[in-house]
Regions:
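Conserved catalytic cores of soluble enzyme domains
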Residues: 1-110, 114, 118
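Intrinsically disordered, low-complexity segments enriched in small/flexible residues
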Residues: 99-169
Length: 169
């Protein structure tokens, strides 16, 4: 949570590049980057398919069903607007031609950083914050995209929560 908070406060661009398996709480932290980029065959989710299958069906063997439902592939995630770009890999995967993949990653970094050159620090900060807030509220998750304009940040009042908890106990 602290790494997400720290990243969200930055007024410089940040890039997250997922090259293999981005999972667990670290996946959430990566989502707080200005741009999230994935290799074509990488996967990205807040839980592993095995973990999801165990929770939903109490059977880790149903991991293929879970993986399909989770939409954790680069292709699925770009359609859901969770990630910003897919970096192509050679047929058979990145390990088949490491130099080509490294060149593709280099070009992606350069291209994405170029987008921020004309932005003020405040614009970079606001773009990152709004992008993060849209996750789960964009196409594929909600029906009315017009509601996105009404997103508001509201600070929790922990004193009121503590008082309420005392009443319940």
């Amino acid at each position: 949570a602290r790494s997400i908070e720290s990243c969200m406060k930055l007024k410089v661009p940040t890039l997250a590049i997922i090259i293999g398996e981005g999972g667990s709480g670290g996946a959430i932290a990566l989502a707080s980057s200005s741009k999230v980029i994935m290799l074509e065959n990488a996967i990205y989710s807040v839980i592993s398919p095995e973990g999801c299958a165990t929770i939903l069906w109490r059977d880790p063997k149903k991991m293929l069903d879970a993986a399909k439902a989770m939409k954790l592939s680069a292709k699925d995630l770009i359609e859901l607007e969770i990630i910003d770009e897919i970096i192509n890999e050679p047929l058979g995967g990145a390990h088949r031609d490491k130099n080509l993949v490294l060149e593709n990653v280099k070009m992606s970094i350069s291209k994405n950083l170029e987008e921020f050159k004309t932005m003020t620090p405040e614009e970079i900060y606001n773009n990152r914050k709004n992008k993060f807030l849209r996750i789960g509220r964009n196409k594929g998750f909600i029906n009315n995209l017009d509601e996105l304009s009404s997103l508001k940040y509201k600070k929790n009042n922990f004193d009121q929560i503590r008082k309420l908890k005392k009443i319940i106990i």
